[in-house]
Amino acid sequence: MTTLNADHFIAHDGVRVPVKSWLPVDRPPTAVVIAVHGFNDYSNFFAAPGDFLASRTVATYAFDQRGFGATPAAGIWPGVPALIKDLETVIALVRARHPGIPLYLFGESMGGAVVMVTIKKAAAENRKSDVDGVILSAPAVWGRETMPWYQTAALWLSAHTVPKAKLTGQGLKIMASDNIEMLRALGRDPLVIKKTRVDAVYGLTNLMDAALEAARDLDLPMLILYGKKDQIIPNAPTELMLARLPESGKADRKVIFYANGYHMLTRDLQGQTVWRDIATWIDAR
């Protein structure tokens, strides 16, 4: 039986999954957010915006996705179906705990991709997703159709010959954020994965393929956030995703581009601007 506890939830298969929450102190919440972290990250990614939203009477729950953080087998790619199932479970548990108020999904990077394919699954099953809207921050939609052929070929070869080999990303000279102090703290955090298996990168790419395709089915209220200085998810696949979103949902969709924004928008030096934009969008619902 799935249950939601103070610091974990029990998944459908009995796995104990860590959970963090940020709740309003002196008033009942007027809305609730489920925050889904990015690749190699974990639930603590939403600590600062979670505190901010709590001050605005918005409750937030975040959990370590399987294969990440303090979950069993951290570093091992769990597969897209497992990621979707866990998010579906958390949605049901949080909805049961907070009935009658709006529930939104926030997904950063890989978390955004998981949110997208979860909504797509509900549409494919001809059922309404039990959420009132989604917030996508630099969603991971860099699918193979927008990658150069040599990149996809090298990834396929590596995944099928040395799947357990680990990559560090050192030497790539990529900035995930302009908040250097925060990046250094992540480097010291033992729950942030530093060496990534090749087969996990392959699995992530499969997820990004699915997320880019899922854009066609995201017909619900949306807030999409993207930094023009993002060096992780290129502009081209992001623009392709935006072009694929259904015309029917355009009136209830807002896109914000941050001229000085990097990939980790909520943790950038201008992160508080992003938090306020999220809170304003939720308040206006």
Task: Locate each region found by the language model.
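Short beta-strand/loop motif that positions the catalytic acidic residue
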Residues: 218, 224-226, 230
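Alpha/beta-hydrolase-fold enzymes
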Residues: 110-197
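N-terminal cap/lid segment of alpha/beta-hydrolase-fold proteins
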Residues: 1-25
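Catalytic active-site module of serine/aspartate enzymes centered on a nucleophile-bearing elbow/loop
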Residues: 252-285
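Acidic catalytic loop of the alpha/beta-hydrolase fold
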Residues: 229-233, 264
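Catalytic nucleophile-loop/oxyanion-hole region of alpha/beta-hydrolase
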Residues: 40-43, 69-99
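Short alpha-helix in the alpha/beta-hydrolase fold that links the catalytic acid
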Residues: 220, 234-244
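Conserved alpha/beta-hydrolase
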Residues: 50-74
